[in-house]
């Protein structure tokens, strides 16, 4: 197993398959990626995952952009499935209604689906497209095939903070987990108008949840808290992702990232942490040399918030 200088094991690899997306959410951080021209081929992704698996990284999440707009998404899942124990995908849900069965058959375990609002006008304002009904159909299909299904709600002040309980009820209705996510930005953007306008702190909400939850659990990843809330005769699982200035969050991060253009990246918010792995792979690097690149990346890891 890979362990960084701060004693944090690295067990998860988050792979961006593309920087492109069929929506245009105004807040999207695009996994912290800069513009690049290279695109990893399925066999290249497979080899990198195989190396990662040898090093104890057994959980992989596929992201984007929107990963399902890649025509070879099913092939990619099928290729990397043998090397991992948990294979998940983060999606905006627009293609799920038609793709869900193929993704499941290829070996996908579970999905996270972005859903910031249940209001069609707001959805179009946030994403640029009027496709909420299509996404809801995809969510309903996914909950029949995958477990668990997580709905990702980025909470934004003045936009959807009034819908938190509506989303909790909806998650209960479709038997999904709701993840409430704070907007996160690097230090240099904390004084930006964007952050001032839209950041909605979730700590007060967690305090409210603590009073009414029938059960509270803590995940190993980031020490995120999961609240089991009684709503409309059901118990709904709500997970809170609160990263800004959260030192506990950073000290319990077990992730390494792989950008769509083939760089290992140690932290979403850093801009100085890219290590090229696709270039050496294409230039004939041996497995041992690729292992060394992973080890170098892990040695570069350090908590962002300290």
Swiss-Prot record:
Annotated ranges, domain Radical SAM core: 5-232
Pathway annotation: Cofactor biosynthesis; molybdopterin biosynthesis
Superkingdom of the source species: Archaea
Binding site for [4Fe-4S] cluster 2: 250, 253, 267
Pfam annotation, one family: Mob_synth_C
Annotated EC: 4.1.99.22
Keywords attached to this entry: 4Fe-4S, GTP-binding, Iron, Iron-sulfur, Lyase, Metal-binding, Molybdenum cofactor biosynthesis, Nucleotide-binding, S-adenosyl-L-methionine
GO biological process per UniProt: Mo-molybdopterin cofactor biosynthetic process
SMART domains linked: Elp3
Gene3D superfamilies, per database record: Aldolase class I
Family label: Belongs to the radical SAM superfamily. MoaA family.
HAMAP family to which the protein is assigned, alphabetical: MoaA_A
Protein name per the record: Probable GTP 3',8-cyclase
Gene giving rise to this polypeptide: moaA
């Amino acid at each position: 197993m890979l362990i960084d200088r701060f004693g944090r094991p690295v067990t998860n690899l988050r792979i961006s398959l593309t920087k492109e997306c069929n929506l245009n959410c105004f807040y999207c951080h695009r996994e912290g990626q800069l513009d690049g021209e290279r695109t990893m081929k399925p066999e290249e992704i497979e080899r990198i995952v195989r190396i990662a698996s040898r090093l104890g990284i057994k959980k992989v999440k596929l992201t984007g952009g929107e990963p399902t707009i890649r025509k070879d998404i099913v092939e990619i899942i099928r290729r990397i499935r043998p090397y991992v124990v948990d294979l998940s995908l983060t999606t905006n849900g627009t293609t799920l209604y038609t793709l869900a069965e193929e993704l499941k058959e290829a070996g996908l375990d579970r999905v996270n689906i972005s859903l910031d609002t249940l209001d069609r006008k707001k959805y179009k304002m946030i994403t640029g497209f009027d496709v909420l009904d299509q996404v809801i159909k995809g969510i309903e299909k996914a909950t029949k095939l995958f477990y668990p299904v997580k709905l990702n709600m980025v909470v934004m002040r003045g936009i959807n903070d009034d819908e938190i309980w509506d989303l909790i009820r909806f998650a209960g209705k479709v038997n999904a987990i709701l993840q409430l996510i704070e907007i996160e930005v690097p230090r240099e953007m904390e004084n930006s108008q964007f952050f001032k306008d839209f950041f909605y702190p979730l700590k007060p909400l967690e305090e409210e949840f603590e009073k009414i939850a029938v059960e509270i659990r803590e995940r190993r990843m980031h020490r995120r808290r999961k609240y089991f809330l009684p709503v409309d005769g059901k118990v709904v699982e709500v997970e809170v992702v609160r990263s800004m200035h959260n030192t506990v969050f950073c000290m319990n991060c077990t992730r390494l990232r792989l950008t769509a253009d083939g760089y290992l990246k140690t932290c979403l918010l850093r801009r100085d942490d890219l290590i090229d792995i696709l270039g050496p792979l294409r230039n004939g690097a041996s497995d041992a040399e690729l292992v060394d690149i992973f080890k170098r990346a892990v040695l570069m890891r350090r908590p962002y918030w300290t």
